[in-house]
């Protein structure tokens, strides 16, 4: 394969102290802020202070410990991280590894991706709100900083708005502080938990899974199986951990996770000890938004802890926002979503900004804050969607293990074991549907509907148009040669480029040749037919060329990774210079130019736009899908922007999209006398 492009292959992530700090700031934001609300949700669900005993607390932290161990450590850290696509992780990267096994696997990939995006909209709202609620009642110089929930809402809205506003400028500068701050945060979690745990080491008996299982059937547990809906909040960040692997590397996650896990477990156990020792203090029930995380801290450090928690919540939110951009970008490259305008605000690999996604996330967060108002209400909706994502990931992991020829007993055992556990979590979280979960379910359904329309609509179009009239470039080689040398036609451009798909090396849609020869003969020195092939590897940057034995026709096949910018204009200029250097194309010296000794002429790109033809003859449902897909194109970025042609000379031409078998109506020619003999329509 000829390759003149500099391949931006995956970076080999070195394991260093700096890299481990970056990992703490990028990967663990979501799971690292869970101690802010997990025990709070468990206690509130059981009736509040005074409505639980020691066995209840032991069973609760036992469930948390084993959930973190089984779901986060075993499934994601030990198994899923090995299912990487050239270093990239996440449900879409996993899908690209297995999609050749069965066409239907696109469904779990889309369902899981839609649910993950929906749940990500709730994370910034719930984490920041929980942190700010800790300021209620806190005195500074004798004054109460925040004394009501309305003030909490406004402060949260200001923080969220600021966070989304700065996305357009890139987060490289503040991102450098994320790692150290999260290191301090996790250390604080561990130390605070250890101090509280040291007052009653007997809480460590919760490491025995017996207490976890016993709690599920204990009469002390007023929630029954549904307590798992709160327990699950401790591991919601596991999917994000897998998705962010490409930013930091598997090795850095392997080394940093034990420290993070220990700090989290210590804090959960410490909160349980404090709750056990203060369970009879019913006065705590009078505290609005009672949170054991903050209450177990000495009054002297509580304000500092709240500030640190707020910073951690902001970092967690930033990680979810960046993760959403990456997820949408991958969905676009996989043709699950329309092409959207993507901006790369810094030179940092993988850092991108999608304006329309940023606006939607911001408005969704504000709507969620305004609708639910308190973190307790948000917790009721949180986690439902992510259980669906985890189930879909388990299904794809099974397919991955089978594709790697893992023993059937291991692959099937993995599927059954994790599916059973996650199904129980899903059932226990289903009650959240009535308590706000319908919000994330509705958002996930809308995202899934858009994905389905775009993906299935594209499939309908491809299935119906691949049989469309195709033409061989060989059959028109002579005409193109004559046209480029015909003095009767003015030179249209030096290099004429069509973005297309070439089948069997030399067949293209006849509408392209119609554009060149019939619509308006376009005389050029070189005719370029460019195909962009998105590969399953994230950072492929390669190409092939075929001139068909001429020096005026070039078939360019670009192979770009699903995370690569499609800067066709830039790539073509390198390709033409490579070909001239190899003697495959003659130079194109320019008489008038600002560039000394310029050897490449001007370029014109012809972009063909499709509009559904009235002649389309397909089933009603399929036609509705196609029409919906064409409407979605209005929110999509223009082909010129998508292919990096914003500053190039582009020509837009509209072509009819005809699907299905075209009915042919034959007219009968009448003589004048026959026409005069036709009965005339009478006026009403």
UniProtKB/Swiss-Prot annotation:
It catalyses: K(+)(in) + H(+)(in) = K(+)(out) + H(+)(out). It is a multi-pass membrane protein. Keywords: Cell membrane, Ion transport, Membrane, Potassium, Potassium transport, Symport, Transmembrane, Transmembrane helix, Transport. It comes from the Bacteria. It is found in: Cell membrane. One of its GO terms (molecular function) is potassium ion transmembrane transporter activity. InterPro entries: K+_transporter, K_trans_C, K_trans_N, Kup. The chain crosses the membrane at residues 19-39, 61-81, 104-124, 151-171, 177-197, 223-243, 255-275, 303-323, 352-372, 381-401, 407-427, 433-453. Pfam families: K_trans, K_trans_C. GO terms for cellular component: plasma membrane. Disulfide bonds: none annotated. Its main location: membrane. Transport of potassium into the cell. Likely operates as a K(+):H(+) symporter. Belongs to the HAK/KUP transporter (TC 2.A.72) family. This is Probable potassium transport system protein Kup.
